[in-house]
């Protein structure tokens, strides 16, 4: 099924974002106040449970149907030496995902997540966005719809991740264009490039921002001009999840960059999202601040693949277990606070 058959359909969806169920959220908050613990003593675990109650539209949210989706794409901008690895590694890692041998396989399994891997035209990289638009409008819509397609009504949680050699350059370009800031604000080592590689990334992004300066600054155009297929797919998944009231757990810098242009246009797009972690990529902390998202974890991770979000999913599962399984003061015959 095509969720966004046109740019207008995408923009209409972005302009009409459903709210959570405030009644369910209030009921969950009231339940937290009655559980056998001092109020607030479980910290953010309480907040997470209440958050999921609102978006799942039930007082006692669950994680029976939790999915991790990893999108993969290749980038034409790699011709400028912005990555430490060749583009062929993207397809090799997709094969590794499908064989069950990657970090995301182990971590999603440990967190009880169903894993879906979506490879997006790996033999057809996006264009070099420092010279032309990364994608045509049709290609960008296809990528948005590929992301939307992984979201099913009734999912309890959607964990998002990516794989794509060169995509940290695209992510930095998206952030620079979205927030009007210098490329160097967002550029980091990515897969491990040296100082010369970082300089090349900054130069490529500066040229891209200048080349596309006169183009519309809409969310769609930013994704199309300097994004990647896997990044646009994440944007499509986040938007579709909002339409279906599915809470989202975001991974690192590249994953979060996908919603930066959407958030500039519609800040409320982040309301159904949790940041799984803050990665070691320098731009991620700044991006989370711009998106007003507080990460659940900070473990120095910088792998991508949805790995940090998968670890955070185990924290979410723990939050829901406490919310559901703890006794109330009345049930346990324990005196509450006075």
Which residues does each predicted region cover?
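N-terminal loops that bind phosphate or other acidic moieties
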Residues: 1-338
């Amino acid at each position: 099924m095509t969720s966004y058959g046109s740019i207008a359909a995408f923009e209409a969806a972005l302009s009409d974002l459903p709210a959570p169920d405030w009644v369910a959220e209030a009921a969950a908050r009231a339940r937290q106040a009655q559980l056998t613990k001092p109020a607030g003593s479980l910290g953010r675990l309480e907040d997470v449970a209440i958050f999921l109650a609102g978006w799942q539209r039930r007082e006692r949210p669950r994680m029976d149907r939790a999915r991790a989706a990893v999108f993969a794409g290749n980038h034409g901008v790699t011709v400028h030496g912005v990555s430490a690895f060749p583009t062929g590694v993207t397809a090799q890692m997709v094969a590794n995902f499908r064989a069950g041998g990657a970090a995301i396989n182990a971590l999603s399994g440990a967190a009880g997540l169903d894993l879906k891997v979506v490879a997006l035209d790996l033999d057809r990289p996006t264009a070099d966005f420092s010279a032309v638009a990364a994608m045509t409008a049709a290609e960008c819509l296809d990528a948005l719809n590929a992301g939307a397609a992984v979201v099913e009504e009734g999912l309890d949680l959607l964990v998002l991740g990516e794989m794509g050699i060169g995509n940290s350059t695209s992510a930095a370009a998206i952030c620079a264009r979205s927030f009007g800031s210098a490329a160097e604000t967002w550029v980091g080592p990515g897969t491990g490039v040296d100082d010369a590689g970082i300089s090349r990334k900054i130069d490529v992004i500066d040229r891209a921002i200048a080349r596309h300066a006169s183009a519309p600054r809409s969310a769609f155009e930013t994704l199309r001009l300097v994004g990647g297929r896997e990044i646009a797919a994440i944007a499509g998944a986040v938007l579709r999840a909002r339409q279906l009231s599915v809470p989202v757990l975001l991974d690192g810098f590249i994953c979060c960059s996908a919603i930066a242009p959407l958030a500039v246009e519609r800040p409320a797009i982040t309301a159904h999202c949790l940041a799984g972690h803050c990665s070691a990529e320098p731009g991620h902390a700044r991006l989370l601040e711009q998106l007003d998202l507080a990460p659940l974890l900070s473990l120095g991770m910088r792998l991508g693949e949805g790995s940090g979000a998968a670890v955070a999913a185990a924290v979410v599962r723990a939050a829901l277990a406490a919310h559901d399984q703890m006794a109330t003061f009345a049930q346990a015959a324990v005196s509450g606070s006075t």
